[in-house]
Amino acid sequence: MPAVGDQHKLIANPFEEPQRRISEYTAQEIATLQSRLEKQLGPEYLSSRAGPSGQKVHYISSEKCIQLANEVFGFNGWSSSIQNIQVDFVDEHPQTLKINMGISVIMRVTLRDGTYHEDLGYGHIENCKGKAAAFEKAKKEATTDALKRALRQFGNVLGNCIYDKQYLAKVTKMKVEPTKFAEDNLHRHSDFVKKEPVEADIMKVDSVGAGARPPALGNEESFEDLLGELDEADFNMADEGHPDEVVLPQAVHNSLNDKPVHQQLTNLNPQAQQSRPLSRSGSTGSLNTRQQPQNSHQFTARAQSRPPQQQLNSNQSRPMGQPVNNSSNANTPNNPQNYTTPQKPAPAAPAPQAGAAVAPAPETVGFFSAKAVTQLPEEALASGQVAPKPGLAFNPHAESPSIRKTPGIDHTKSKPLARNGQHVPPAKTTETEAEPSTSLSRPAGAHAASRPVTMNEARSASGSFSRAGPPMGGNAGNMGKPNVVNPQLDHTRRIGAPGMSGFSSSPSTNRGQYRPLTMKRPAPVVGGGAGQTKDGNGDSATTTTIAANTTAGSATGGNAAPSAGNGGRVPLTDMSANASNATAAGAATSGPEVKRQRLA
């Protein structure tokens, strides 16, 4: 049976103080708290406001004080409680009905080990319109002031250092840099958080048996080469036109210990490798692609299975950087346009031994355009086993509509062009030096009676428009020689310039060339003379002969004027004191009338 008074034990007495659990600090924790509390605050924790008589009053704001308490004691290491609230005064103005109020609060701050400090805080308000607003403002101010004063009793770090005048005079002179706002530290609602896409590289791994060994992948350099290809690739290509070709690397299926192709060919033909400079294929540009290692007997079997004509064509189209192991091509004389010396025949590759395992030939790999590569599956690109397909293969002979081309010119071949826009056949390499033209002056003697060579005949004989005479300059004899290095460019160098065989090729030689003057032929003179017609009617005039010129020259003192019919210059009339002599000499000679000078 329950005893008397047991019915009251089921209900807790609200007037009794509950038993508190006290967790004491260890000596190490006390030493740590003591070292923290002894430190002074930095200038970033201090605030200032205008005080009485224009002085600055420094204080610590409530939010910074609570933050410091949480840092030192922990968020669960301290607590605060209001011990007493007392209203000191409440005054209401009789006319304006405004309220003045003052409230004092006693606050206690307790640590988790039971240590506590109490202090008094005060709050007041003047000329408030309502009582509720006056009580709210006064009580909050008193409580905050009491809390800050209670916390400062624990040490300097919680605000006690502000009452040190020397410290305050020095710390206020320190400059505080503005803090940077960190948006990442904000606590955001899940609906307003920006969801950034996570780029996860999903690797497709084929299922491999427990006892099976995974296929050997390429070297680590292959991945670096792939990155290099992506860096140099041009992804900003237009939709129309033909983009640059892309070379797909072959997958490495053999073991990493096999020798690569260029090593085997270097052992087979070391002399050819030394004499030939390294070069790159025009289709690959500067991309370094790794070749698939193969055995030497595979190349030998392939070369024997092809017909001779196909081997010859493949060797001719092979770039300079790749070795040639075909002995028949080494004996063929080189083209004159190639500047390499003939190579010695390379020794033939040894025949495969009987019983040796012959690896199957790799699948054919073709060139694809940039648009076609995007249509290929990723599995085929990763394995490297991509066979050329019709419609996707790269066509090197396709013409781009975006490139302007001159109509009527074959753009597939490199040929010289004339000024009229037509192709010029290449000049013959067996062109001989032209003989110098005959001089116009003949020596006096047995050939004096013969007709001298006119200027027109000298031009036709020499094939040049330059003046007649011996070659000028020491290099005049080399002008007729063809261009041995590039014979097809001989005629392109001479476009627009006259033939210079046997004469100097300087453009200044054409400036002094002779041009006959135009003149009006006078009426024929009736009478016996060298310039008369045979019948005296003037129907047909004969050309002045050499004898007539010689006779006229003898009459005038040996200076005969060349006739206009032979292209000579007609001298002007002498206006000096010897004009009478010149007139007499002109009357004695036969021929057309001389050109007279016009008098003003």
Swiss-Prot record:
Residue ranges of DNA binding: 148-152
InterPro entries: DNA_recomb/repair_Rad52 (IPR004585), Rad52_fam (IPR041247), Rad52_Rad59_Rad22 (IPR007232), Rad52_Rad59_Rad22_sf (IPR042525)
Segments of skewed composition (Polar residues): 268-319, 502-512
GO biological process: DNA recombinase assembly; double-strand break repair via homologous recombination; double-strand break repair via single-strand annealing; mitotic recombination
Compartmental location: Nucleus
SUPFAM superfamilies from the UniProt entry: dsRNA-binding domain-like
GO MF annotation terms: DNA binding
Pfam families in UniProt: Rad52_Rad22
Cellular component per GO, a single term: nucleus
Subunit structure: Part of a complex that includes mei-3/rad51 and mus-11/rad52.
Record's protein name: DNA repair and recombination protein mus-11
